[in-house]
Amino acid sequence: MKFKNVAEELEFSQKRYKIKNDIEKLFIEKKYINYETNLVEDIKEDYLKNLQFKDSGVVKVIGDDGRISILSRDITTNLLNKLIPNWDLNSKAKLFYYGKIFKKDNNKIKEIRQMGVECIGLETIDSDKEMIDLIDSIMKNYRNKYIIEIGTSEYLKGILSEFYLDEVEYNFIINLINKKNKEDLKKYMKKFEKTPSREALENIIDMRGSIEEVLIKVEKYYTNQKMKKGLEELKEINSYINNEKIDSENIICDLSITSSLNYYSGLMFKTYYEEANKEIIKGGRYDIDSDGYGDIIPAIGFSVEIDEILRNLYKKGNI
């Protein structure tokens, strides 16, 4: 963000500090503890590099001895790389963090402030509900009109599991869904005519609305166990939203969310302020197979773009 003068820049910095403290106070009230991660990661310790970060946007640092390190590009990954090797299945942690991540963009290094929470080792549905509560509390603290977009990775992954797709086919379908290209998706799926979940996939783009509306829409389509698991998660969340008096006007359910689909293992969410196209909060469930033998550690979390909150408030004259 460009400033007219030093006073304006200092004011922006002070307001950023206040927002950070407000959110930190909320996390502490919910019994989260602060955890600090490193700015520099050893690439050999990256347990999740094959899941979420195949892009070329990472910033590499080459030492005098030729050893390659990476400037932190995601605090969650950095945090897990440090904690999971020593984790036992009875451990539990509610953590919050504040730090910087770095991404390469058009040969420039972009520095991004990131704040967030991770809930690791705790009961799945309870931590899902707590995430929704925290997200809603943060968003409504700054604006009345906002969107919390909720989905579940399990529904779409369940659909796709029926097709036995190769990588090219999989990526082509995901790309069509991302572009909301229903017409070409239907044409492409004709070759899978006998697959039970074909019709659900052809109509996945239309599975958007309130959680109640979406749950009604999916009733007429084939569902396998994985798809049902995702829908049951949404029912639980919908019941929680109604009971806790979270304003359902701000909630949109979208079963066609595909971002980092292979990384997530359940609830997914992202938030926006009205008339803004950049995410404020994003995250979801990413249960971890800690040893490769099926011992699963439940985990869910989200990150908050504090500077994006500030930019949005300044743009609207709300701050």
Protein language model features and the residues they cover:
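Auxiliary tRNA-acceptor-end handling modules of aminoacyl-tRNA synthetases
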Residues: 1-12
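Short, surface-exposed recognition loops or helix-turn segments adjacent to catalytic cores
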Residues: 145-156, 173, 252-256
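Short, conserved phosphate-binding/catalytic loop or strand-edge motifs used
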Residues: 111-115, 151-158
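A short acidic (Asp/Glu
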Residues: 157-162, 264
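Acidic, His- and aromatic-enriched active-site or binding-groove loops in soluble protein domains
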Residues: 57-63, 165-187
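Positively charged, Gly/Ser-enriched RNA/tRNA-binding surfaces
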Residues: 12-31, 35, 42-44, 57, ...
